[in-house]
Regions:
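Short boundary/loop segments of OB/S1/cold-shock single-stranded nucleic-acid-binding domains
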Residues: 1-35, 82
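Helix-rich effector regions associated with P-loop NTPase G domains
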Residues: 3-5, 30-33, 58, 70-86, ...
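Short aromatic-glycine-enriched beta-strand elements
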Residues: 45-49
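A short macromolecule-binding patch
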Residues: 56-65
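Canonical P-loop GTPase G-domain recognition
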Residues: 155, 162-215
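A conserved segment at the C-terminal end of the G1
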Residues: 217-233
Length: 354
């Protein structure tokens, strides 16, 4: 039997790389020369970003770099850009990095959908635009938006429109215990009364505007930002609902010395809260949260022993406490996969608040 020969490095054959390319590596370029940008709008995989160049600010269209994988890029994101940053009609840059987000407003399709849908990053405030009539105000939708603002760490602002058609008092009374700031606007032959107060509230910050179609949100944006040309719609006489006119979120700079930005979003008909845990939902009802001290351990707030019933019956949450408790319970049931909340049902009238 032939003895085995000792092998050395000369016996190793290295197969040549047929493509002549470098082997794969997990190391990725750092892009230390990348330019900072701020995402203004997103459209079919293209990101319009504001960058500050030698000649001042200008807009750049970019695509997402492959290295980012499935990482999402949304309006309000602070990003790092490389490539053609000229802003010319045929120029296309690349988003190579998304910076850490300070806040993130998100929603889900419904209360049982596990997929979160990021809406706007790095905002300071959520302005909930609600018409007092035509279409009727939907209190439960307002409650949902307040929960989303609380969960995202955003300040909340109620902007009530069409006060020329109905008094804002009954609606505001329901939210008085929350101390949520508000502005009431009305249409007049000379324009929109209350617009200056809205502008003062928004100056120096990034504010997201949300609301049902038909509540006058796009009209408000066009008045705040002349030249914005956001399409306005009409309210269906039969359904009482508006038509979606804004099709994508868009950040617009507020004119004037105070500065600031508004992010106009498409009209919404639902605002799922599957991403918000029940305890956070309860905490976002501060007028009711104090009453939970009388609840038994592990209370679901929808059982006979719940202390919130006695708390609201005694007026602990104000005149609208009972209606607010029902809104909370509907949210919790919907999130648990039970009875669907009526945020998509026919409009809630002001009288339903209490």
């Amino acid at each position: 039997m032939t003895p085995r020969r000792q092998l050395d490095e000369s016996d190793v054959r290295v197969r040549p790389n047929p493509r002549g390319s470098r082997p794969r590596t997990k190391e990725r370029p750092r892009h230390e020369d990348a330019v900072a940008g701020w995402v203004l709008t997103v459209d079919r995989g293209r990101y319009t970003c504001l960058v500050d160049g030698p000649d001042g600010e200008h807009e750049v269209v970019a695509m997402k770099a492959r290295d980012l994988g499935k990482a999402g890029v949304v309006v309000g994101d602070r990003v790092a850009l490389v490539g053609d940053l000229s802003g010319g009609p045929d120029a296309l840059a690349r988003v190579v990095r998304v910076e850490r987000r300070a806040t993130m407003l998100r929603r889900s399709a419904d209360d049982t959908d596990p997929i979160e849908r990021p809406l706007v990053a790095n905002a300071d405030r959520l302005a909930i635009v609600t018409a007092l009539a035509e279409p009727e105000p939907r209190a439960r939708m307002v409650d949902r938006c307040l929960v989303a603002a609380f969960d995202a760490g955003l300040q909340a602002l109620l902007v009530l429109t069409k006060a020329d058609l109905r008094d804002a008092g009954p609606f505001l009374a329901a939210y008085a215990p929350l101390d949520v700031p508000y502005v009431v606007t009305r249409r007049s032959p000379s324009g929109i009364e209350g617009l200056d107060e809205v502008r003062e509230r928004l100056e120096g910050s990034v504010t997201v505007l949300v609301g049902h179609s038909g509540v006058g949100k796009s009209t408000l944006v066009n008045a705040l930002v002349p030249g914005a040309s956001r399409t306005t719609g009409v309210v269906n006489d039969v359904t009482g609902r508006g038509r979606h006119t804004s099709t994508s979120a868009l950040a617009l700079r507020l004119p004037g010395a105070g500065g600031g930005w508004v992010v106009d979003t498409p009209g919404i008909r639902s605002f799922g809260l599957a991403h918000v845990v029940p305890d956070r939902i309860v905490a976002s009802f501060p007028d009711l949260a104090a009453g939970t001290a009388e609840c038994p351990r592990g209370c679901s707030h929808d059982e006979p022993e719940c202390g919130l019933d006695a708390f609201t019956a005694a007026g602990g949450a104000g005149a609208a406490g009972v209606a607010r408790l029902e809104s909370l319970r509907r949210l919790l049931r919907s999130r648990a996969g039970g009875v669907a909340d009526a945020h998509e049902d026919p409009p809630d009238g002001v009288e339903a608040l209490g």
